[in-house]
Amino acid sequence: LTGSAEAKEGQITGGYVHDVEAGLHPWIAVLDFKSMYPSIMIGNNVCYTTRIDPSHPEQPGQDDATHVSPTEAAFWTTEHRKGLVPSLLEDLMNQRDEHKAQIKQARKDEQVEKEEFHDSMQYAVKIMMNSFYGVFASGFYRFTHKDLGSSITAWARQNIKTIIQKLEDEGHHVVYSDTDSIFVCSPVPEGSP
C-alpha cells in the first residue's frame, strides 16, 4: 500500500459512494446524471469570479440573492454577476448536445464516419467540461480556492443523497451509488423475464 487512500491535508471531500449491496440483482436501472459537476457549476454560478469572500468589503445585502453551498461558501447569482466558467460551460454543454443530436442523425442516415466524428467530438467536450472541476479542486491552479471544489462536491453529495432518500421513500431499493450514478432495483413484477 502506498498510503494514497489516506486523507491528505487540505484535500477536499469527493463524491458520495453508497455502500454496495453484494449479490446478484435482477432488473437494475442505472440513473446517471448528465454532466453533474458542470451542471452544478452552471446552476450555482460557481466560479472564482463569483465567490463571495467574507473578508472582502463587497458583501451581499439582505435583498441580494446568493447561492450558499452545503459548505457555507457563497456565490453571487447570475443576476449580480455571471461567472466566466459557468458561461464557458453553458457553451460547451450546448456544443455537446449538438454533437449528440448529430450522432443520432448520422445513425439514422447510416453515415458511420459522421457518427464517429461527432461521438469523438462530444466525448472531447465532455472531458473538457469535467476538467473545470479538476482545476477548481486543484491546489496548483492560480485562480482557484478550496471553496470552489468543495462546494461542487458538497452540492453533488447533497443532490445524490436526496434522490436516494426519495427513491427509498417511494419503495425503490437502491443497491449502489457512486458520485453521479444510482443503481436501483427496477419495479418489475416478480417472475418477469
Where are these regions (language model features)?
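Conserved acidic
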Residues: 1-193
